[in-house]
Design a protein with these regions (language model features):
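Ligand-binding pockets and gating/stacking loops
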Residues: 1-225
Length: 226
């Protein structure tokens, strides 16, 4: 509901967009304020059982813009309508101190960070992949679950985990991915890669290949070059 109301307020920017002379700004305005966009962002159209499938708290699903279940449900609606690239952000994982309680990030929350974050993410991802499969669009939709770096395997002096780029995992589903396999392995503590290290370049090449693009081909756009 908040998303729909926010989009309705974009009407105040109509004159600015039309008088700017910026074609990209005008196009972005038309896209955001279109009836198709408004319909896509209206999660109230979804049956209650679908919202419950995505969220640990279906009531919060329509109110909290940071709710991972709501975001994944919205992602599915956008994909259904032909949006080619959708990003879902799940925040709250940067816990450098006191992992035993989540209250340092959310006052009043007595759960540990893992108990506060993992169940919702787990349910949302499972719901998204299952829902895409039920609608026969998983095979044409690549789902990528990743972060920019991992966390230190050892707890630091303040009871948290710091940034750790040496070893972490990425999950992929749909889009032609052969499921049911794990590529590479870490040592016993999860500190370093023990077998088949995968680089960012390897990951990018896999994504390009699944999208039907040749990762070895260099492409240059001259559209904005003078």
């Amino acid at each position: 509901r908040k998303m729909v109301n926010a989009m309705n307020r974009f009407g105040d920017l109509k004159s600015k967009a039309e008088s700017s002379g910026d074609r990209d700004l005008e196009q972005a305005y038309r896209l955001i304020t279109s009836e198709r966009a408004k319909a896509a962002f209206n999660l109230e159209e979804e049956p209650q059982q679908v919202r419950e499938r995505y969220s640990l708290d279906p009531r919060a699903n329509l109110q909290d813009s940071n709710n991972i279940g709501q975001q994944c449900l919205l992602a599915r609606r956008l994909v259904e309508r032909g949006v080619p690239f959708v990003t879902v952000n799940n925040t709250g994982w940067d816990n450098h101190l006191n992992l035993a309680t989540y209250a340092n990030r959310n006052p009043g929350d007595s759960r540990s960070a893992s108990h506060a974050l993992i169940p919702g993410l787990d349910k949302a991802i499972a719901a998204l992949i299952g829902d895409l499969a039920d609608r026969d669009i998983l095979d044409e939709t690549l789902v990528l679950i990743m972060t920019d770096f991992g966390r230190t395997p050892k707890i630091n002096s303040t009871g948290g985990r710091d940034h750790w780029p040496n070893c972490f995992s990425v999950a992929m589903a749909g889009g032609g991915v052969q499921g049911g396999q794990v590529i590479g392995s870490s040592d016993a503590l999860g500190e370093f890669v023990a077998d088949r290290p995968i680089t960012p370049g390897d990951l990018s090449s896999t994504i390009y290949t699944l999208l039907g693009l040749d990762p070895s081909r260099e492409s240059v756009s001259y559209t904005h070059l003078t």
